[in-house]
Amino acid sequence: MTVIIFLSVLLGTIILGVPVAFALLICGIALMLHLDFFNAQILAQQLVSGADSFSLMAIPFFILAGEIMNEGGLSKRIIDLPMKLVGHKRGGLGFVAILSAMIMASLSGSAVADTAAVAAMLLPMMKTTGYPIHRSAGLIGTAGIIAPIIPPSIPFIVFGVASGVSITKLFLAGIFPGVIMGCCLAILWRWQAKRLNLMTFSKATKQDLCFSFKNSVWALMLPVIIIGGFRSGIFTPTEAGVVATFYALIVSLFIYHELPLKHLPKVLLAAAKTTAVVMFLVASANVTGYLITVAELPTMLTILLEPLIENPTILLLVIMLAVFVIGMVMDLTPTVLILTPVLMPLVEEAGIDPVYFGVLFILNTSIGLITPPVGNVLNVITGVSKLPFDQAAKGIMPYLGMMIMLLLTFIFIPELILMPLQWIQ
C-alpha cells in the first residue's frame, strides 16, 4: 500500500504539471499522513538538512563557472580549437561537436548547458553546409550527455551526497567511460559521414592552428587544474568548484576581456536561479528519502529481489532496466535523488562496488536525457534546431542505441570502469 501511495502521488502531481521539487514535497507529506506521524517540525528539519551539506556547495560554484565561461568567451574558444584540428575532414563539424562537448564536459558538468552551448554555435553552421539537420542535432545531443560522466559532474556530486560514496572516486571513475563514449560516437559518426556527401572545409594552416591553441590555452588549462587538483589532494571537489569559478572569472575579465563588469550581475542572477532550482529539488528529495527509509521501502525491495543478490550481473540488469524506464519520464536529478536511497542497500548487500554502480547509474539516467518522451537534452536540441520533436527523436535514435549498447558493455565488463580507476588512483 505504501508503494502504491508513493507512486500514485508522485506520478499524479507530475502529470498535473506540478514542478518536481514540489511534487516530491507533496509526496513526502502524503507518506507522513499514510504512516500516521505527520510532524511539521520533522518536515522542516529534513528540508533544511537536505541542502545543508558541504559537498553540495560545489553545485552553485560549478554552475556559476559554466555561466562565466559562456559569457566570458571560454566556450567559444574551446569550440574554435577542434574546428581547426578536425574541421577539414569529411563530416568534420560532427567531430568538432564531439570534441567540443567532451572538453566542455570537463568544465561545467551539466548536460543541458553543454548541449545548448555547442548546439547554438555549431547547428547553424552544419545546416548551411548541407549536413542533415536531424542527424546533426542527434549527434550534438548525445555528445552532450558525456557531461554528467566526465568530471566535474554535478550528477556525481548529487549521487555522492545521496549515497555517501566518495565524490572524488566518482569523478576519477568517470574519466575513462566518458572518453570511451566520445570515441564510440566518433566511430559511428565517421561511418555515417562516409555515406553522406558532406561539405569539407579547407585545412587550417599551422599558423592558424598555433594561434587557435594559443588563444584557447587559458580555457583548456581549467580541466587540468580541476582534475589535477583533486587527484593530487590539493583540494576537494567542493573547493575545485571555487577554484573553477575564480579561474574562469579572472580569465574572462583580465585575459579575454569579454565579460564586462556591468554584465556580472546578470551572470550571477542566472547562476542563482539555476542553483535555487537544483538545491530546492535536493532538499525536497531529502524529505521523501527520509520517509522512504522510515517506511522501509529499501528493505521491501531487498526482500523482493533477494533471489538475484547471488548473481550481481542479473541484478544490475534488472535495476538498470527499471532506471531506464523511469528515466524516460523523469529528469536526471530527481531520479537520482529518489532511487539512490532505495537501491543502495540492495547494491551493498549484493557486494557491487558502489563507485562502479554510481557510474552505471548516472550513465543510465543521462541516457534518459535523450530518450523520448521527456528527455531534457532532446528538448534543448529540438528548440535550437527548430525541428519537430518527432524528427529530432528520429535523428537521435542511432546514437541512443549505441549508448544503450555501451551501458550493457559496462555491465558485463566492469573492468572497463574499475581497472582505469585503479590506475588513476
Curated annotation (Swiss-Prot):
Cystines in this chain: none
Domain of life: Bacteria
Topology with respect to the bilayer: Multi-pass membrane protein
A single cellular component GO annotation: plasma membrane
GO-annotated molecular function: carbohydrate transmembrane transporter activity
Record-annotated membrane-spanning stretches: 3-23, 24-44, 54-74, 93-113, 139-159, 169-189, 217-237, 241-261, 275-295, 312-332, 334-354, 355-375, 399-419
Chief place where the protein resides: membrane
UniProt record similarity statement: Belongs to the TRAP transporter large permease family.
Protein name: Putative TRAP transporter large permease protein HI_1029
Organism the protein comes from: Haemophilus influenzae (strain ATCC 51907 / DSM 11121 / KW20 / Rd)
Native organism taxonomy: Bacteria, Pseudomonadati, Pseudomonadota, Gammaproteobacteria, Pasteurellales
